Amino acid sequence: MKVLVINSGSSSIKYQLIEMDGEKVLCKGIAERIGIEGSRLVHRVNDEKYVIERELPDHEEALKLILNTLVDEKLGVIKDLKEIDAVGHRVVHGGERFKESVLVDEEVLKAIEEVSPLAPLHNPANLMGIKAAMKLLPGVPNVVVFDTAFHQTIPQKAYLYAIPYEYYEKHRIRRYGFHGTSHRYVSKRAAEILGKKLEELKIITCHIGNGASVAAVKYGKCVDTSMGFTPLEGLVMGTRSGDLDPAIPFFIMEKEGISPQEMYDILNKKSGVYGLSKGFSSDMRDIEEAALKGDEWCKLILDIYHYRIAKYIGAYAAAMNGVDAIVFTAGVGENSPITREDVCSYLEFLGVKLDKQKNEETIRGKEGIISTLDSRVKVLVVPTNEELMIARDTKEIVEKIGR
């Protein structure tokens, strides 16, 4: 079975075509700057990269170019679009309704649209990708995999906010959590690496990229996560503030004379590492490099960043009454030995002992255990693979309906 995985953003479509027998990626790429000047398709087959400059006014045109490229004589990896058995889509927000991945029908499309106010930047773009695929590949089943679904097992005590309950009843304001597909994949893979059943383990997964979140996974089910009603809560991120006193935005708005929308943009796009570094960079690699060269301010930023992660790990060890494994994933988590070492230095009370050499060596797509043999809690690096998780869900659902 061949599954086309699509991640449709506001001005881009990322894609992978995966042969599910052996789970081999046949090709992958991104159509970028959709609806903007300078749009193009970057297509990769094995290690070869091809760039097609083309005007892409909308998502449908972008997907059309992707599909044409898949069957192209020179760049293609299949002879006919009929070889695509199913399409799997990433959808950021499924609200409370979707607790697992589902087959797309009119009712599902309507439900995704209904929860769009909860993810105004993402869900409408995700929908454009789904509708384009349904139009251009008629008769091919489409499956949606929600970022929020994995966190729907979180209990009320962890998802309700201490604000008037009517706001939950009226507007469904609660903790939803994000990066769910990543947390699900790496917790599952960590159990495989440890040679244990997921249902027997208490795992804390740390998805540390430009966006970042921590999840407490108890016996295979998520019981808490650091992102909340929106992806703004929790850790210090590339451009997002993470946790802060809710009175601060009101104070700034009053003092600076700025609107709610401007404040929202500041917290989402100009805060976090970018804000702390006074606009120097939102990329942790730049901060690390400057800190290693002796920049005291960047050293402090690293301290703030790592401290927040360690605090959440400590909290989730308490929430689960113990922890067996801590997993690092995503851009920073997979490639920054400094981050992993510094975070783990706070966790010695849990019995965490890091193997310095293994920690240094486990970067650039490598996976494995980076704690010592006698470490009471195992520490792992697992490169995330959300696309594969989406493809697996898609295959499972399509096989169930017997297509």
From Swiss-Prot:
One matching Pfam family: Acetate_kinase
Transmembrane segments: none
Single annotated GO MF: magnesium ion binding
SUPFAM superfamilies per UniProt: Actin-like ATPase domain
Annotated pathway: Metabolic intermediate biosynthesis; acetyl-CoA biosynthesis; acetyl-CoA from acetate: step 1/2
Single GO biological process annotation from the record: acetate metabolic process
Binding site for ATP: 14, 207-211, 283-285, 331-335
Classification via Gene3D superfamilies: 3.30.420.40
Binding site for substrate: 90
Reactions the enzyme catalyzes: acetate + ATP = acetyl phosphate + ADP
Enzyme Commission identifier(s): 2.7.2.1
InterPro entries linked: Ac/propionate_kinase, Aliphatic_acid_kin_short-chain, Aliphatic_acid_kinase_CS, ATPase_NBD
Alphabetically ordered keywords of this record: ATP-binding, Cytoplasm, Kinase, Magnesium, Metal-binding, Nucleotide-binding, Transferase
Active-site positions on this chain: 147
Cofactor(s) required for function per UniProt: Mg(2+); Mn(2+)
Site (Transition state stabilizer) residue list: 179, 240
GO terms under cellular component: cytoplasm
Annotated coiled-coil segments of the chain: none
Function: Catalyzes the formation of acetyl phosphate from acetate and ATP. Can also catalyze the reverse reaction.
Subunit structure, as described in the record: Homodimer.
Entry's family note: Belongs to the acetokinase family.
Protein name (Swiss-Prot/TrEMBL): Acetate kinase
Encoding gene (name): ackA
